[in-house]
Structures are given as structure tokens and as C-alpha cells.
Amino acid sequence: MNQSLTPSAGTDSKTGSSKAISFQDYLDLSTLDWARLRAILAPALYVDYTKIGKEKWDAMSADDFMAMVSNDDFLGDPCVKTQHLIGATYWERVSESKVIGHHQLRAAHQVYTSPDLKTVKLRGHSHATNEHYYVKSSGVWKFAGLKPEVRWNEYKFEEVFKGSYTQSEKHS
């Protein structure tokens, strides 16, 4: 894996982007490698969760993004295991320094009763498309945001995250 995330031999000639960065960001999310994820983030991210019942941030700081995704109410929950698989993808070149990746995703989630990960409490999987935004900063491609759109969910996806919008609605 090209750790610097610069375009490599696998670079798409039309976009100038590297498929390595999209693989890297999903690997980091699936393994919960927060340091590696932080290393590929742009200083500010466009985060649009409106299609999944949450908010939109036009310029969320990388630190705030990390705090959100690594929080115990989200992917930082030690009882949640996840794997994000990328399906069909196409790249849209916006400029020499901005690319949008359009990705088909399946995100599998399993919640355990305790951090020892021995007993499964529930499963929840999501099938979605996702726009990922990438910017080139100092010659290096960085992950600059996302905009998911869920097509459909399996099992009890709405119960996977303690901080999920459905959990919040149950308490209001």
C-alpha cells in the first residue's frame, strides 16, 4: 500500500486520482485504525449525513471528524465491529486538485454484548452509494468528506450505533 496516498501506477488517467486512497479510508474505518485514518484527512471535510437523518457540515475540521467517528456512540464503540466493502466505483474529476469518488458500498456491522466480542447481540448491514471527496494538498491526495445515501438496510441496522438518529428519536 502506498502510505503517502499519492497517485500511483493505479491512477485513473481521466481523474488523476488513486484508487489507493478509497481503499485506505475503508481499511482504516473497518480496522478502526484512527491514526491511519487521521493521516489521510484533509484539514476540513464536507460531511453530508442528511440522507441518513443527521446533519450536514460544510467545513468540519479533521479533529472534529475524528472525534465524531471515533466516539463510543459511533464507530468507537468497543462492542461494534464493521467492514465497509466497495463495489462499483467511478471517478469524477472536478479540477486538478479535487476529485469525487462515487462508490457503491456494503457496510456490515455486528454488535456484541461486551468488549470481549464473544456473544453477538445484533447485526445490521447497509447497502448504499457514497460520494467521497478528495483534495490534493501539497501534492498528496487527502480524504475531504463524504455524502452517503442508503438504498436499503438489513437486520437491525438502526440499532447498531448508540448515537444513531433512530436511537435519538426513540428518546424524544
Curated annotation (Swiss-Prot):
Membrane-spanning residues: none
Keyword match Lyase: yes
GO molecular function, one term: scytalone dehydratase activity
Keywords, ordered alphabetically: Lyase
E.C. number(s) listed in UniProt: 4.2.1.-
Record: active site: H84, H109
GO-annotated biological processes: melanin metabolic process
InterPro entries reported in the protein's UniProt record: NTF2-like_dom_sf, Scytalone_dehydratase, Scytalone_dh
Binding site for substrate: Y49, N130
Pfam families linked to this entry: Scytalone_dh
Class of this enzyme: lyase
Lyase keyword on record: yes
UniProt family annotation: Belongs to the scytalone dehydratase family.
Its job: Scytalone dehydratase-like protein; part of the Pks2 gene cluster that mediates the formation of infectious structures (appressoria), enabling these fungi to kill insects faster. The product of the Pks2 gene cluster is different from the one of Pks1 and has still not been identified.
Subunit relationships: Homotrimer. Each subunit contains an active site, located in the central part of the hydrophobic core of the monomer, which functions independently.
Protein name per Swiss-Prot or TrEMBL: Scytalone dehydratase-like protein Arp1
Species in which this protein is naturally found: Metarhizium robertsii (strain ARSEF 23 / ATCC MYA-3075)
Lineage start: Eukaryota, Fungi, Dikarya, Ascomycota, Pezizomycotina
